[in-house]
């Protein structure tokens, strides 16, 4: 894959039937606030939430696929009505199973991830997307580098571009 900020072709974008998101570093800015009792808090961008609503309205299937098992991920997925699979050290088998279950070819899917544990999923899909502030280890696997950072409008940017090219 090519390391580029270039938006994929309209033909490629029109083939996207599903979007799979990592959570930390995509829905969030990859930081966590930890209380003295160990409870974790993150900040998500409301514009990104609107982006997922727009994708849902366009009948794009969505999944949050997270290495961490965390109530924050479940809560955000529930609020946005997005299926969540979490607590998986190896994401690729889960991605493959989910795509098969939803009758979506890997080439008809986009994966948005930001770190080394997303690398195999990024390599597996038709459109590999990373936020601008993704870890350097995933840049070479990206077909599309967003201009926005994770947790700061990256999902909304993706949704707006995808849907404006349909």
Tell me the role of every PLM-derived stretch:
Residues 26-57:
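A positional/architectural concept
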Residues 15-17, 60, 107-108:
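Short coil/turn segments at beta-strand junctions that form active-site/ligand-binding loops
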Residues 41-45, 84-85, 92-166:
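Mg2+-dependent phosphoryl-transfer enzymes with acidic/Ser/Thr/Gly-rich catalytic loops
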Residues 1-23:
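Non-catalytic pre-domain segments flanking phosphatase-related domains
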Residues 26, 51-76, 85-86:
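Substrate-recognition element of Asp-dependent hydrolases with the DxDx(T/V) motif
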Residues 15-31, 122, 155:
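Asp-based phosphoryl-transfer active-site loop
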């Amino acid at each position: 894959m090519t390391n580029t900020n270039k938006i994929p072709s309209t033909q490629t974008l029109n083939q996207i039937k599903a979007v799979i998101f990592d959570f930390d570093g995509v829905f969030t800015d990859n930081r966590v606030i930890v209380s003295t009792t160990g409870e974790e808090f993150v900040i998500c961008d409301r514009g990104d939430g609107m982006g997922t609503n727009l994708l849902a309205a366009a009948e794009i299937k969505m999944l949050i696929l997270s290495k961490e098992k965390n109530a924050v991920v479940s809560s955000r997925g529930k609020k946005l009505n997005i299926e969540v699979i979490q607590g998986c050290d190896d994401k690729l088998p889960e991605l493959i199973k989910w795509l098969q279950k939803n009758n979506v070819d890997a080439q008809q899917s986009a994966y948005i991830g930001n770190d080394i544990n997303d690398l195999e999923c990024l390599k597996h899909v038709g459109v590999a997307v990373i936020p601008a502030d993704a870890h350097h280890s995933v840049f070479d696997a990206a077909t599309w580098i967003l201009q926005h950072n994770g947790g700061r409008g990256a999902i909304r940017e993706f949704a707006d571009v995808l849907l404006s090219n349909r």
